[in-house]
């Protein structure tokens, strides 16, 4: 006990020393060229072009032929989802995909929002841009950039968009009405992949900042989870004067002295400001540690040799579906590992899930999306300058209880000193906008209300 108190005292002093040194820094904006070859002498075409998702008989026939030739290994008895995606349930997915799923219909769903492309730093950047159908008299819409992660895509936001752009017609107050921009990270979906090494979250942040300027927004709001959280954080570090507010549902806070308090155990947690809810979500330590180990194997592969596994996944739609949908199971709720079907249809429809898979399959971007891990983590954890820079823009955070790792308010506030809103969400996991659009929309609106009171 006395040893624990001594360790807590020493760690408390270290935390105080780090916090007292706090100073505002920003990242260097810089520039880049990620297209093939050298940057041309001519100025880049800055036009914004309408884009439409399309398909063809050839694309669908090729998919069906590949699906029909699938080979599955029988699962172990009573293994459920503990060994990964259960191939007995995968048979149901395959049958639905081949015989019921209507990709042409889903293409129409994708096209219900306006799509565009524009060239930035040599890459064709895809985004959807949804404006409010109506605005209260004398009001303007708040520009909100929403950024996805892996293995997600812009489609994750389709259910939350109307709650933000047209709240009155969805049972919400029109006090906050948004104009929503959802880009695809370069190398994901319809955004062109980099031809050069080194395209990381800071490069993506700079490109999305240029996108917002090109759309005419000098000031804007940001929202993100997974990689989107890091990209939005980097935008706030690059151009804080342009970011009016930052809302996150994931916080990457590894280079944060407060995270060390996690290792002191549950009994001393209260000394460092952990609430009862924090303690429930973080402990027992062994359970959280093993969850992180179980759920991070993919990260090691993608941070080291993404192209190898990418070759397999880009050649097999069934393999791609198993690889991605397993994340939609356990990252939504780790207890879904105990279910024969991984609990996938408890939160999502098969049409929704297969649409995500098709956006990776038809664009052939699984390999380039995985490279984003190597570019960001390949030099080692805590090796990037942005990890040591705090974010000095107003921030809101939604802590969903089934997120892979819970981030207590103390952890978040150390990285984001201007945290003005921290919410323990009632339910939900990693894919917040996709799984719980109403809850996430409510928290974004709550954050905006607090922000405007300042």
Curated annotation (Swiss-Prot):
Active site: 226, 373, 430
Cellular compartments per GO CC: endoplasmic reticulum membrane
Residue(s) carrying Dimethylated arginine: 294
Reaction it catalyzes: cis-stilbene oxide + H2O = (1R,2R)-hydrobenzoin; 1-(4-methoxyphenyl)-N-methyl-N-[(3-methyloxetan-3-yl)methyl]methanamine + H2O = 2-{[(4-methoxybenzyl)(methyl)amino]methyl}-2-methylpropane-1,3-diol; 8,9-epoxy-(5Z,11Z,14Z)-eicosatrienoate + H2O = 8,9-dihydroxy-(5Z,11Z,14Z)-eicosatrienoate; 11,12-epoxy-(5Z,8Z,14Z)-eicosatrienoate + H2O = 11,12-dihydroxy-(5Z,8Z,14Z)-eicosatrienoate
Cytoplasmic topological segments: 22-454
Keyword Nucleotidyltransferase among record annotations: no
Listed InterPro entries: AB_hydrolase_fold, Epox_hydrolase-like, Epoxide_hydro_N, Epoxide_hydrolase
Top-level taxon of origin: Eukaryota
Enzyme kind, highest EC tier: hydrolase
Protein name (Swiss-Prot/TrEMBL): Epoxide hydrolase 1
Species whose genome carries this gene: Sus scrofa
């Amino acid at each position: 006990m006395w040893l624990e108190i001594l360790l807590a005292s020493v760690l408390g002093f270290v935390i105080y020393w780090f916090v007292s040194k706090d100073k505002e820094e920003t990242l260097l904006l810089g520039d880049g060229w990620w297209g093939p070859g050298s940057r041309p002498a001519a100025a880049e075409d800055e036009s914004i072009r309408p884009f439409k998702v399309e398909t063809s008989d050839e694309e669908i026939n090729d998919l069906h032929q590949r699906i029909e030739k699938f080979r599955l290994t029988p699962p172990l008895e009573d293994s459920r989802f503990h060994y990964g995606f259960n191939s007995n349930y995968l048979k149901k997915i395959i049958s639905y995909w081949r015989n019921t799923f209507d990709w042409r219909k889903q293409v129409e769903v994708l096209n219900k929002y306006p799509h565009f492309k524009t060239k930035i730093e040599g890459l064709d950047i895809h985004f959807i841009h949804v404006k409010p159908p109506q605005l209260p008299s004398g009001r303007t819409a708040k520009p909100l950039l929403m950024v996805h992660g892996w293995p997600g895509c812009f489609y994750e936001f389709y259910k939350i968009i109307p709650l933000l752009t047209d709240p009155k017609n969805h049972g919400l107050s029109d006090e906050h009405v948004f104009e929503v921009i959802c880009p695809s990270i370069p190398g994901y979906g319809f955004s062109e992949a980099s031809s050069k090494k080194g395209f990381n979250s800071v490069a993506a942040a700079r490109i999305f900042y240029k996108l917002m300027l090109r759309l005419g927004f000098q000031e804007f709001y940001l929202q993100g989870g997974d990689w989107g959280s890091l990209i939005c954080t980097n935008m706030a570090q690059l151009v804080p004067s342009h970011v009016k507010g930052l809302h996150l549902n994931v916080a990457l806070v590894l280079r944060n002295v407060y995270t060390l308090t996690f290792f002191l155990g549950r009994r001393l947690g209260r000394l460092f400001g952990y609430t009862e809810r924090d303690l429930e979500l973080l402990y027992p330590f062994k359970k959280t540690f093993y969850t992180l180990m179980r759920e991070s194997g993919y990260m090691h592969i993608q941070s080291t040799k993404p192209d190898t596994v990418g070759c397999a996944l880009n050649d097999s739609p069934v393999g791609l579906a198993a690889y991605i949908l397993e994340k939609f199971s356990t990252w939504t709720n780790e207890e879904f590992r105990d279910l024969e079907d991984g609990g996938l249809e408890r939160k999502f429809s098969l049409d929704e899930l297969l649409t995500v898979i098709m956006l990776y399959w038809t664009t052939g971007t699984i390999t380039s999306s995985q490279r984003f891990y190597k570019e960001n983590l390949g030099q080692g954890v805590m090796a990037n300058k942005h990890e040591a820079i705090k974010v000095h823009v107003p921030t809101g955070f939604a802590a969903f209880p089934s997120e892979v790792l819970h981030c207590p308010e103390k952890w978040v506030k150390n990285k984001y000193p201007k945290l003005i809103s921290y919410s323990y969400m009632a339910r939900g996991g990693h894919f917040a906008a996709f799984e719980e659009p109403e809850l996430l929309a409510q928290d974004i609106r709550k954050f905006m209300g607090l922000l405007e009171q300042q």
